[in-house]
Design a protein with these regions (language model features):
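An N-terminal structural lobe/cap that precedes and organizes the functional/catalytic core
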Residues: 2-101, 105
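Short beta-strand segments
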Residues: 54, 118-120
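Short, charge-rich binding segments
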Residues: 107-111
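Conserved acidic residues
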Residues: 115
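Conserved small/polar residues in nucleotide/adenosyl-binding loops
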Residues: 123-124
């Protein structure tokens, strides 16, 4: 079965981070990133890209994968009707590996263009 991927229509080069999210895990990518991806389709909302900050040693593998993929990934939503939708997500504009560069996170917190800071929701 061939999967159709619905791609975003905005130019990522024009998107500016307005949200800093600390802890870029699965829940964040399936929810906050998805809805932000939809918002960025509106040309008047191009200042709401996401900067992700990853802090834990266990996050390094995902950080490296996302960097290699230019911070893009796909998300499949399994419909109750049995029809799935796969989206290309491009709302993650910037990614900081806090273990290598903790000062970059502090600088991003102080960035005047960051309007919202959201923390990781689920921890062990």
């Amino acid at each position: 079965m061939k999967t159709q991927v619905l791609s975003y229509n905005y130019n990522r080069e024009h998107i500016k981070p307005g949200i800093l999210h600390i802890g870029v895990g699965n829940f964040h990518r399936a929810h906050e990133e998805f809805y932000t991806n939809l918002l960025l389709e509106d040309p008047t909302q191009q200042d709401w890209g996401i900067c992700g900050a990853m802090l834990l040693p266990g996050d390094e593998r995902l950080y490296r994968i996302l960097e290699k993929q230019k911070k893009e990934y796909t998300l499949t939503i399994c419909g109750r009707d049995g029809k799935d939708q796969t989206y290309q997500i491009g709302s993650l504009i910037e990614l900081i590996w806090g273990i290598e560069n903790p000062a970059a996170i502090i600088n991003k917190i102080a960035d005047k263009n960051i309007h919202i800071i959201t923390p990781v929701s689920y921890t062990h």
